């Protein structure tokens, strides 16, 4: 296994995407804009209901940190993804997709069991609501992760969705210890308002004594800090991280370090599907930082890539599209 720039740990999920009405969300007690965990039987029932009344848009490999890692790799970085899939057809599809994107994985990721699935429900306003059956990924532990590449990586990236699993939190703790021992920077995303609302203790455990870079959106930031303004939330989050990035949907993002706080405007696009947008932002931002770009440039690239993800269905772009967008962005920067 060769050295990598980014070492990420997260859930492995296959997405099934549907266009749905707001009424459908209400009828099935699904809180718009959040992720809700469920069991296999309940998800199967929802899937049946979706097939009967809603518009199917397709299947895609997902998982928040995996989407981030794909963006990072497709832009030109090197990456490893630690996860857990079942020894089934979906598990093979999932790992094959990562490998095709140039992301390193390990055979230890495959276990007896069922690969996790996520029903991604996209409402008319492009917001994504998710119902997730974690399957075997709920039991992700250090045993499924090869930590050797972490020792020489530049970044460890952790998704907040892992806050619901005790074994995953233990794996993250081990990863954090290795990262700190080898001078590897740590990035964490809060992932979802539902994680802040229902798994705060788990998030606190992932955050531990702080990180180098924290990603969140405006709602997550204010919920986690129990504040009513982005500015107050930012001030509190800076107590936990050297760099804080708060995304503001179409309005862009606020990025803050010990030296400066900047605000970068959004990019006007026709929003179709918000699924994976924040993940793409994080992957693009990390890639730009890792290649030596400043915060302003990193945020501008991240907004470009994430806005393209929003303008189509599915959590990821085609691999070649990331590279083309980067080329166009660099030409504009040099002009």
What are these regions (language model features)?
Residues 1-13, 18-19, 27-37, 53, ...:
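Conserved phosphate-binding/catalytic region of the ribokinase-like
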Residues 155-232, 251-253:
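Conserved beta-alpha-beta core of the PfkB/ribokinase-like small-molecule kinase fold
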Residues 149-151, 207-208, 238:
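A short, aliphatic-rich alpha-helical micro-motif
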Residues 117-121, 252-255:
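Short beta-strand scaffold segments in enzyme catalytic cores
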Residues 42-117, 134, 328-333:
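Substrate-binding N-lobe of the ribokinase-like
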Residues 79, 105, 186-187, 244:
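Hydrophobic beta-strand scaffold residues
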Residues 108-110, 120-166:
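Conserved phosphate-binding/catalytic loop of the ribokinase/pfkB sugar-kinase fold
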Residues 102, 135-142, 193-198, 226-227:
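Short gly/ser/thr-rich secondary-structure transition/capping motifs
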